[in-house]
Amino acid sequence: MNVDDDFEYYVINLDRSKKRWQRINKHLQSMSIEAQRVSAVYGADLPDDEIARYYTPYLNQKQFFMPLKPAEIGCFMSHRKVLKSFVDLSDKAYAVILEDDVEFIGDVLEYQQQWLDAVQGEEPVMLKLFSRRQVHGQVVYTHQGRSTIRPHLVPLGTQGAVLNRSAAYQLLNTLSQFGMPVDVAYQHWWQHGVRVLVTVGNHINEISAQLGGSNISNKQNLPLTYKIKRESKRSWFRLKIKLISMFYYMKS
């Protein structure tokens, strides 16, 4: 079976980051993968009326502990753009969505059965391919020593994921407007209705540091008191999400 038979590969990449696209495209082509490049949305360049179509202060106050940065808004809109491209333009069953600062660990062919075990079927499912920390949860699939778990808490980050068409439609419909970062939104599976699974052992490496770090963030020199207040809010928010997630996990 050709690696492209079931999966459509997408790479989110800023227009100005040509070298990143060239690097990851070469990496993927070495495994006979022809990926679709999706031009990332650069939040700092968005007009206010375009932002207001998707990001609202009302939702932000309800959903998150601080206003989103332009980079976070652009990131969310970029991921929506990929999902829209998949459902509108692809006839394949599954999408593999990658950011441009990753690379696969080993050959993709080694992972495909694990992906299929997770996302095939009518239920909307997303399989995350990377986590910075160990993830705890229930093992739902095991194939040739590779396990997939349903996590107690969905890990942050959107470095790479596989999802089926049902999941793409579900996320587009339920996250048409937002007030929190896209990876935080994905943590709220009890709201968007997509089953989120995670591979035990990463399938990709994050190599942002080797490429010069993030190319979308605008670092600012902020007062120490502001930083302390922000981190205090962040800690409380993360604890709240962890507790709520465990509550719904135990109910399901």
Segments (PLM) and residue ranges:
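An acidic/histidine-cluster motif and surrounding catalytic segment
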Residues: M1-L98, V102-S252
